[in-house]
């Protein structure tokens, strides 16, 4: 958690809050959203403000090795000293036309040797208020890029397997992370990079001015739930832009209803057909999709193909259990709460009504059967007549 940077300092002062109070509010909101989406909590959650002394030590190492220099109380990384700078995005040194931090120079950056050098340590200014730490270069605070490199290498070591982030962070942020980390340690920083594409709304970039800016809370307040939002997000490959629409959420809701109905049918199955072969084929297709650049959308397609195949048959109890185990295994990856889908308990009066309707249907007394159906619908119970008998669910 980068709980100290230009934006958090600026916005906390604007709201008249301490940096700690301001960032803790948004940290709590972030984890509330994670819970709503059924995201597992990380093993370690680090805050930049807890690592400032380690960052100062990291910057000193870069200065001592000749990769960084001090100007007017700030410390900058000398890009020209790191020959592999830009390798993540395929840049050559002659391609550097602008400042590597991707912004115009701030007032405290006029002393840089080269316009493309980026700040490792920023000297204190009046705009920082009471946010500063003492360092060998005077009062100041860490730059944004150094925070991530120091925290990740502290918990994972100088080299780790996978570094994730939005596609917009490839340059300059991740590029700068690689440069400062590898210059300091002399080792490869991350073996693999996982860059996630943007989410757009109704085919356009999200923006408050366009009136199409939505948070997860906005979606939940419109009556959708985190499970539906999660499924929608899973449905697009991470390398592809996700076009968010409320029509898409409605379709997702119906898809999840079909999945739940499928699971309930399996739990009650007692037919003649062996569907264990379909389960084995689906497991293979699901795993192959995941091994193909984490193709979750392909894995979902494998699950739906399984549903289509099984729904054409009347599964035996034993093979239905096999299919359930397979789908629950899928859910260990998907996190859609499928193991929690159970038939709710009905009170005796409702159960009696369902049995009465079944008797009426056997006698071909359709008028009575329809009357009971409508009566139960008024109580929030929706009936479904299937080849395996009458099933029910709570109406939306």
PLM-predicted stretches and their roles:
Residues 205-206, 212-396:
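Structural preference for alpha-helix termini/caps and helix-kink/transition segments
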Residues 1, 31-32, 53-267:
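Alpha-helical recognition segments enriched in aromatics with Gly/Pro capping
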Residues 50, 143-147, 294, 298-301:
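Aromatic- and histidine-enriched alpha-helix N-cap/loop-to-helix transition segments
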Residues 1-38, 389-392:
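N-terminal, positively charged nucleic-acid-binding surface of large information/translation enzymes
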Residues 41, 71-72, 385-389:
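Short Gly/Ser/Thr- and Asp/Glu-enriched loop/turn motifs at secondary-structure junctions
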Residues 17-19, 27, 31-57, 67, ...:
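Non-catalytic interaction-recognition regions
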């Amino acid at each position: 958690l980068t709980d100290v940077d230009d934006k958090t300092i600026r916005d906390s002062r604007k709201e008249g809050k301490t940096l700690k109070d301001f960032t803790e509010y948004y940290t709590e909101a972030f984890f509330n959203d994670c819970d709503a989406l059924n995201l597992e909590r990380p093993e370690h959650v680090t805050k930049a403000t807890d690592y400032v002394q380690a960052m100062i030590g990291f910057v000193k190492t870069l200065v001592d090795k000749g990769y960084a220099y001090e100007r007017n109380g700030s410390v900058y990384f000398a890009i020209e000293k790191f020959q592999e700078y830009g390798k993540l995005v395929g840049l050559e040194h002659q391609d550097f036309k602008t400042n590597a931090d991707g912004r115009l120079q701030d007032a405290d950056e006029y002393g840089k040797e080269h316009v493309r050098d980026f700040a490792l340590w920023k000297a204190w200014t009046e705009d920082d208020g009471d946010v500063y730490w003492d360092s060998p270069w005077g009062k100041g605070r860490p730059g944004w890029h150094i925070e991530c490199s120091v925290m990740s290498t502290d918990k994972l070591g100088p080299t780790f397997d996978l570094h994730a982030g939005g596609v917009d962070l490839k340059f300059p942020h991740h590029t700068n992370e690689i440069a400062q980390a590898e210059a300091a340690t002399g080792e490869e920083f991350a073996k693999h990079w996982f860059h996630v594409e943007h989410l757009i709304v109704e085919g356009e970039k999200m923006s408050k001015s366009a009136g199409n800016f939505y948070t997860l809370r906005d979606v939940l307040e419109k009556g959708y739930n985190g499970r539906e939002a999660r499924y929608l997000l899973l449905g697009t490959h991470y390398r592809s832009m996700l076009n968010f629409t409320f029509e898409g959420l409605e379709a997702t809701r119906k898809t999840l209803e079909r999945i739940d109905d499928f699971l309930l049918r399996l739990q009650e199955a007692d037919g003649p057909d062996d569907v264990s072969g379909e389960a084995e084929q689906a497991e293979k297709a699901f795993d192959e999709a995941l091994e193909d650049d984490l193709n979750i959308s392909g894995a979902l397609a494998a699950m739906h193909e399984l549903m289509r195949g099984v729904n054409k048959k009347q599964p035996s109890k034993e093979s239905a259990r096999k299919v359930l185990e397979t789908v629950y295994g899928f859910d260990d990856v998907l996190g859609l709460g499928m193991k929690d889908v159970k038939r709710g308990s009905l009170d005796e009066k409702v159960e009696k009504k369902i049995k009465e309707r079944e008797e009426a249907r056997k006698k071909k007394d359709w008028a009575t059967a329809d009357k009971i159906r409508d009566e139960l619908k008024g109580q929030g119970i929706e009936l479904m007549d299937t080849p395996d008998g009458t099933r029910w669910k709570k109406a939306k």
